[in-house]
Regions:
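Reductase modules of NAD(P)H-dependent flavoproteins
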Residues: 60-181
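Short capping/connector residues at structural and topological boundaries
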Residues: 10, 25, 29, 45, ...
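FAD-binding FR-type
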Residues: 1-31
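Hydrophobic, well-structured mid-protein blocks that either form specific transmembrane helices
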Residues: 22-79
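N-terminal start-of-chain detector that recognizes signal peptides
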Residues: 3-7, 30-31, 51-52, 80-83, ...
Length: 181
């Protein structure tokens, strides 16, 4: 996937299937968008759309060290950073940044590594805030037939009658209470 794309030249042709699944809804008067690592870029379009719809957007971004997309997020959001090494913003995680800055929201949207998503899911449950998370898995078929991208769910699905959700078809965005991560 990504490696093949990186070797492409202008004019090269590809076949692609997509987009797959669903995306984030653009709701909330005071939404918080949270991105960690490679989960940061997917949140930029959402932050811009939310701002355009009149929302007061807060972005909490988690990095190892080097910051990116700061100006782009700043044009649509109040931006708070967390870095593992303390290079900028809060030293620690996005959860640390949320607590340190006493941030609140009426809805949370998040994309990033699973440990971060687990912590955000827990925080949202404690604060009783709806939370939508974007999960990532390799998607072999992209249409939900192969079940390679399933995650555990609270309810049985109609497709296989087990507690699974297909990330490519039922997601990748889920209400955090629907899935186990």
């Amino acid at each position: 996937g990504t490696e093949a794309f990186s070797k492409m030249q202008p004019g090269d042709k590809i076949e692609a299937l997509g987009p797959l699944g669903n995306g984030f809804s653009e709701t909330g008067k005071k939404p918080m968008v949270i991105g960690g690592g490679i989960g940061i870029p997917p949140m930029l379009g959402l932050a811009k759309s939310l701002k355009e719809s009149g929302s007061d957007v807060t972005a909490v971004l988690g990095y190892r060290s080097e910051l990116f997309l700061q100006d782009e997020f700043a044009s649509s959001s109040s931006v708070y950073n967390a870095t593992e090494d303390g290079n900028s913003g809060t030293k620690g995680t996005v959860i640390d940044a949320i607590k340190e800055n006493n941030l609140d929201a009426d809805i949370i949207f998040a994309c990033g590594p699973k440990p971060m998503l687990r912590a955000i899911k827990e925080l949202a449950a404690q604060k009783k805030i709806p939370c939508y998370i974007s999960l990532e898995e390799r998607m072999a078929c992209g249409i939900g037939a192969c079940l390679a991208c399933v995650c555990k769910s609270r309810e049985k699905d109609a497709h296989s009658n087990v507690n699974n959700k297909r990330i490519c078809k039922d997601g990748p965005v889920f209400l955090s209470t629907e899935v186990e991560i």
